[in-house]
Structure formats: C-alpha cells, structure tokens
C-alpha cells in the first residue's frame, strides 16, 4: 500500500520546510528500527497550486502503518519535529491518500 501526505506550506517557508524534511525519515529509522519500511520520499509540487509538499511511503498493510504511526507518535523526538514543522504549515494535511 502506498501512503501520501500532502501539506500546504506557508508562503516564505518552503526553504525551511525543505531543510526539515530530511529529518523525518532519519528519525523514523531511529524509532522504528527494523520496522522502518523506507524509503520515505519528499516531493515539492512544481505544477498546479504553489506551496505544496508531499511525503510518500509504502507499507504492507494499513495495520502495519498504524502500528508504525503509534510508535512515532509516542516518541518525543518525533513530536518535536512535528511541532517545529507545524509552524511553517497552513494546514496540517490537506489530503491523505492511500493506494492499495
């Protein structure tokens, strides 16, 4: 299954978000260890609405993704990254998409 998280970036914050983006997969590897199913791809939209980014990752099932999300959400380092990123977002998620 493929998971996509699309987010709207505040105008003027794209550079900061692009710098922070690489920290998320690094932290996920630390927290999840052998359960890390990477790679996590980070993309910036170049056609269509401006100031959008997307994270994309794959897991074998929705249950596996939910288990990984619970581990990450219980990690203080992950929560600190989310808090830092949220300062640069207009919306936390404008659309999460799952492809089976």
Predicted segments — roles?
Residues 5, 17, 55, 65:
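Hydrophobic pocket/interface hotspot
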Residues 15, 60-73:
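Short amphipathic alpha-helices within nucleic acid-binding modules
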Residues 13-39, 73-82:
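Short amphipathic alpha-helical segments
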Residues 6, 35-54, 76-100:
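Glycine-rich beta-strand-turn "strand-cap" elements at beta-sheet edges
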């Amino acid at each position: 299954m493929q998971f996509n998280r699309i987010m709207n970036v505040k105008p003027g914050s794209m550079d900061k978000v692009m710098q922070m983006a690489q920290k998320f997969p690094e932290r996920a590897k630390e927290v999840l260890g052998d359960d890390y199913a990477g790679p996590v791809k980070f993309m910036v939209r170049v056609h269509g609405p401006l100031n959008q980014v997307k994270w994309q990752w794959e897991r074998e099932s929705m249950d596996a993704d939910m288990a990984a999300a619970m581990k990450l959400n219980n990690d203080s380092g992950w929560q600190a990254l989310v808090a830092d990123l949220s300062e640069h977002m207009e919306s936390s998620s404008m659309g999460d998409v799952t492809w089976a």
